[in-house]
Swiss-Prot record:
Any single biological process term in GO: translation
SUPFAM superfamilies per record: Translational machinery components
Name of a matching Pfam family: Ribosomal_L18p
Matches recorded under InterPro entries: Ribosomal_uL18_bac-type (IPR004389), Ribosomal_uL18_bac/euk (IPR005484)
Name of the molecule in the record: Large ribosomal subunit protein uL18
Species this protein is from: Chlamydia muridarum (strain MoPn / Nigg)
Keywords assigned: Ribonucleoprotein, Ribosomal protein, RNA-binding, rRNA-binding
Superkingdom: Bacteria
CDD domains, per database record: Ribosomal_L18_L5e (cd00432)
One CC-aspect GO term: cytosolic large ribosomal subunit
PANTHER family attached to this UniProt entry: 39S RIBOSOMAL PROTEIN L18, MITOCHONDRIAL, LARGE RIBOSOMAL SUBUNIT PROTEIN UL18M
Assembly behavior: Part of the 50S ribosomal subunit; part of the 5S rRNA/L5/L18/L25 subcomplex. Contacts the 5S and 23S rRNAs.
Length: 123
């Protein structure tokens, strides 16, 4: 018999694969990946062709700690979206593919996307 924890984690992995199988990022149009945990938010620009992370920021990063963005809430998520847009602009990236992972496009995930749009990234 399967445990409830196993069902939960395998279901989350299936949802993430279902979303990611349609998304491919390149150096010109990288994938903006959002991962959230119970305490933190992680945002990355990923080039899937090379298999490299172009830029990343999280609520654990030094730049976030100096800005006071250390907790997982919607205000900080929006600020992280703006900061990842600035990092993308410095890499001459203006178009992205948004990867919400296994999460609904709601709350913190939606605020990261809104912040990235405000920062000048186009989806």
């Amino acid at each position: 018999m399967e445990s409830s924890l196993y069902k939960k984690t395998s279901g989350k992995a299936r949802r993430a694969l279902r979303v990611r199988k349609a998304l491919k990022g390149s150096s010109l149009k990288p994938r903006l990946s959002v991962v959230k945990t119970n305490k933190h938010i992680y945002v990355q620009l990923i080039d899937d062709v090379e298999g490299k992370t172009l830029a990343s920021i999280s609520t654990l990063a030094k730049i976030s700690k100096t800005s006071g963005l250390t907790k997982k809430n919607q205000d900080n998520a929006k600020a992280l979206g703006v900061k990842i847009a600035e990092l993308g602009k410095s890499l001459q990236v203006d178009r992205i593919v948004f990867d919400r992972g296994a999460h609904k496009y709601h709350g913190v995930v939606a605020m990261v996307a809104d912040g990235a749009r405000e920062g000048g990234l186009q989806f």
